[in-house]
Design a protein with these regions (language model features):
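A ligand-binding cleft/hinge motif common to bilobed small-molecule-binding domains
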Residues: 118-122, 251-270
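Periplasmic-binding protein-like
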Residues: 158, 222-227, 233-234, 267-291
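A generic structural signal for short hydrophobic patches within well-formed alpha-helices
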Residues: 120, 169, 259, 311-312
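Extracytoplasmic ligand-binding site segments that recognize negatively charged/polar headgroups
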Residues: 61-75, 87-103, 107-248
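A short alpha-helix/helix-coil micro-patch that ends at or immediately precedes a cysteine
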Residues: 74-82
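Short, low-complexity disordered leader/linker segments with a strong preference
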Residues: 1-57, 373-378
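Mature extracytoplasmic/periplasmic domains
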Residues: 280-348
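Conserved C-terminal helix/tail region of periplasmic/extracytoplasmic solute-binding proteins
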Residues: 340-378
Length: 378
């Protein structure tokens, strides 16, 4: 009898152990939901407080380096959502950089919207941008689409390439260039347009791309050779694309989404897009807060807005067909229909570009003898 009681007692103890183990495994499930709920509640509370503070400031001033149509509707949407008056001005990235450098910590604008990150990095290094840890940055597709210290956040990705007027090339008896090296062929003399290295972030990306592709000295020499065929250097990066369809520009170097705009929205079926056969690079279009801005809470709210579908989904309905870089956005199908692939790009060294672009621009302009009248912006 005693032996039987001992066996029963042992079985009860083992059962108790299993029951204990089972309850310990389920414990995180009972606490995970409240923890997530608390986080969401804290984020919602933060946004409510930020919106109230931004509305108390009443105004936001935006400098936009994206296309003006997209800039306008984004600013209108922000004003509609939050009841904050938005003033905006469209400037190239180089113009924005020059403006806030001159204002030196007392900016007339609050935020920068659009344009490639190279000028943003120069301004961040000069202490002209304000770091901000955005709540909506959690939706970015990867760390490559933000500054590590929060000085800027990516909103889109654009592919660099050529746009050509096939009617004009056919009339001239010339084939479509397929790669970067083709553009230095003397037969294309006077047919190429490129943006200005001094004023356009697109042109700065071209410099970085050639140096990373060919090496420092060879990259600068490539740009010297290319210069012999360049007819016009435009102030803005989208300038070449806007003149290809009319035939004024026969070969334009720039972002291919700008070419799509000309084909789809403006009806220029004579434009062909060319992705360089040996590879190409890309921009990350960004947004940032100016250090010392007059409306800091409205500026922070803009960053949250810019990292949301409310903002970025407006792009493709307003002539901007870049790939989007947040996980809850709707990608522009038309970009892939034209053969663009956001992953089919070279391994672009953003750190080298960040640290050296100012020096590279100076070196290129020196190699070009300081630049002729084509580089005048007035």
């Amino acid at each position: 009898m005693k032996k039987l009681l001992a066996i029963l007692l042992s079985l009860l103890m083992v059962a108790g152990l299993f029951a204990g183990c089972g309850s310990s495994e389920k414990a995180p499930e009972t606490t995970a939901a409240p923890a997530a709920a608390e986080t969401e509640a804290a984020q919602a509370s933060y946004m409510d407080e930020l919106i109230a503070a931004a509305q108390a400031e009443g105004t936001l001033v935006v400098y936009g380096s994206c296309e003006e149509e997209y800039l306008a509707v984004a600013c209108e949407k922000f004003q509609e959502l939050y009841g904050i008056e938005v003033q905006y001005q469209r400037l190239s990235t180089g113009e924005v950089q020059s403006k806030i450098e001159e204002e030196n910590g007392n900016p007339s604008g609050d935020v920068w919207f659009g344009g490639t990150t190279d000028p943003y990095n120069v301004c961040a290094a000069a202490g002209l941008l304000e770091a901000y840890e955005a709540q909506n940055a959690s939706h970015l597709l990867g760390d490559a689409y933000r500054d590590a210290d929060g000085y800027w956040y990516g909103i889109y990705k654009g592919i660099l390439g050529f746009m050509v007027n096939i009617d004009e090339l056919d009339r001239l008896g010339l084939e479509v260039p397929q790669d970067w090296a083709d553009l230095t062929d003397p037969k294309y003399e006077g047919l190429i347009w490129l943006s200005n290295y001094n004023t356009a972030g697109t042109a700065k990306l071209v410099i970085n791309t050639m140096i990373q592709k060919y090496g420092h000295d060879e990259g600068i020499q490539y740009l010297v050779d290319l210069d012999k065929n360049v007819q016009v250097y435009t102030k803005s990066g989208s300038g070449p694309s806007k003149n290809v369809g009319t035939g004024e520009c026969v070969i334009g170097i720039g972002f291919l989404h700008d070419g799509i705009t000309q084909i789809v929205d403006n009806g220029y079926g004579n434009i062909q897009l060319v992705i360089p056969s040996s590879g190409t690079s890309y921009e990350i279009g960004a947004t940032a807060i100016f250090k010392g801005c007059k409306h800091p809470n409205a500026a922070k709210l803009w960053i949250e807005f810019a990292l949301s579908p409310d903002c970025v989904n407006l792009a493709q309905d307003n002539g901007s067909y870049q790939f989007l870089v947040i996980d809850n956005a709707t990608q522009p199908e038309v970009a892939t229909e034209f053969g663009l692939d956001p992953e089919n790009v070279m391994d672009y060294d953003f750190e080298d570009a960040k640290n050296n672009i100012t020096t590279y621009v100076e070196e290129v302009m020196t190699a070009l003898g300081g630049g002729d009248d084509r580089f005048k912006t007035e």
